[in-house]
A protein has these predicted regions:
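Conserved phosphate- and dinucleotide-binding cores of soluble alpha/beta proteins
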Residues: 1-157
Length: 157
């Protein structure tokens, strides 16, 4: 039996720095625009597994991790099935099977928008960051297509 092991996973549990209301994840750039590291196998395992669960606290200090738009897309939302936070669980609407199964499970199910609203209520919506035109990193998908780029953050002076 040949092929990538990630394509044979039933479940994968991943962490993230940010997730947006489209279930896109960012594991490379902090909410302050600082390059944190590489994406590793995050997008590969998310795409390959039958069910991708991403865990994150709702807030990192006073910074919301659930937001309208991630700083950088490293894992596309169509490959993410469930977001688990300390304030509730959001299931991607494309996974009706999971939504139906969760109805009678007595779990704190919320929409991703509800989680974002809770985060913005507990800590203000972050101001948009400003970037230069200079690209400092390229985010590629499994097939080598460019998903996003990381630009140099403008000085805070």
């Amino acid at each position: 039996c040949k092929g990538a092991v990630v394509n044979k996973l039933d479940f994968v549990i991943l962490g993230t720095l940010e997730v947006d209301i489209h279930f896109n994840c960012n594991v490379v750039v902090s909410s302050e625009g600082e390059l944190m590291g590489a994406q590793g196998g995050h997008p590969d395992t998310a795409a390959g597994a039958k069910c991708t669960i991403v865990i994150t606290p709702l807030l990192q200090g006073r910074i919301p991790t659930i937001r309208n738009q991630v700083t950088t897309v490293t894992t596309p939302g169509e490959t993410v099935d469930v977001i688990v936070t300390d304030y509730g669980i959001a299931i991607n609407p494309k996974r009706q099977d999971l939504l139906e199964a969760a109805q009678n499970a007595h779990l704190p199910i919320k929409t991703i928008e509800q989680l974002r609203d809770i985060a913005y209520h507990r800590a203000k919506e972050p101001a948009p960051l400003e970037y230069e035109d200079k690209v400092v990193a390229i985010i590629e998908s499994r097939d080598g297509t460019i998903m996003d780029v990381v630009r140099k953050r403008k000085d805070r002076n």
